[in-house]
Amino acid sequence: MKPQFPSAPRRRVMILAGILALVFVSASLLARPFRPVEPIPAGIVDMHCHIAGLGAGGSGCFVSPRLRDNWRFKVYLRSFGVSEQEMLQQGDALVGDRISESLAQSKLVSRAVLLALDGVVDADGNLDTNRTEVFVPNEFVAAMAERHTNLLFGASVNPYRRDALARLEWAKARGAVLVKWIPPIMDIDPSDPRLVPFYKKMAELSLPLLSHTGEEKSFSRATEALGDPEKLRLPLGLGVTVVAAHTAAAEKYHGERGPDRLARLMREFPNLYADISALTQFNRRGSLKEALTRPEFSGRLVYGTDYPLINTLMVSPWYSFHLSLRQKFSIWRTQNPWDRDVMMKHDLGVPTETFARSAKMFGGTNVSAVRREIHADERSK
């Protein structure tokens, strides 16, 4: 019987697949971390954990119709581990409960800073719901942090609000450990001189600023120029501790790479840090290596995940040639998202001090004491 051979097109596909498999296996066998691997410390705090809601249960949250019609919406629901129907039936607090439950099952991460997200503000200093894609009020996140001991309150205040300074003071009194901005979607220009009083109040209250820098593709619209790290020069000069989220990766400003602009600021300001959240995402390949090996970033990196995006296909050990096959399988088999994230970043060379820095910067707040004061005030009313 005459043997049957694959057709020419099929042979080409098989040869190409074989070559790719050989390259993949060879790269995995030769895999090396970006820097020497160090021990994983205890009590890690994730300083960059998002939450969202639909307004169910009186949370005050909302997602714009435009974003709800976008493909990203369903991805985010799945990554939070909830369905729209569940949220409508049980309330938005379900999302916070699920986050806390998953975090409690982590062997490596003990707490997370849960982030509120203010919206766009109009010319009168009020929330502009027509231009806001996602809104997560401080009251909702503060309540989640009071409800779950493994969640810390990350506030968000648009500095253009009429009562912005009072909102800062309220957040601090409720135990906020930082203020979160995403300037490209909140229409905030961090270099605006009108924000000087706001920055001075932040410095007075010892509230650090966690501000998005670099590419922003998580929403249906964004003004990328507002993510330029150079715009953070004003708050830095006024003594505000600033954490540049994502190391300004994957974006250019005025023809210059974001990380290059951030590195220049690092040399000038000792109160500037950068978090490593999202640096293992597919669209930021190579960014973690630069962060770990660039001398300007040494001693300035802070651990964060950008949860829930670590629960999406954007993050996978299979994208990296710097992990061995054994490491890839070990990470891939790990069920808890925080443990997966720590394991992958650890195996890629994230040092002990980076994992530990979040707890030193944000985990020292006596949250229990703050909660006791809040409950005592409520009882006295």
Please identify what each model-predicted range represents:
Residues 3, 30-33, 241, 248-381:
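H/E-rich (His + Asp/Glu) clusters that bind or coordinate divalent metals
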Residues 61-63, 80-89, 121-133, 218-226, ...:
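Short, flexible/disordered intra-domain loops and linkers
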Residues 94-101, 137-139, 164, 226-232, ...:
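Alpha-helical scaffolding within the catalytic cores
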Residues 116-224, 288:
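Active-site gating/metal-coordination segments in enzymes
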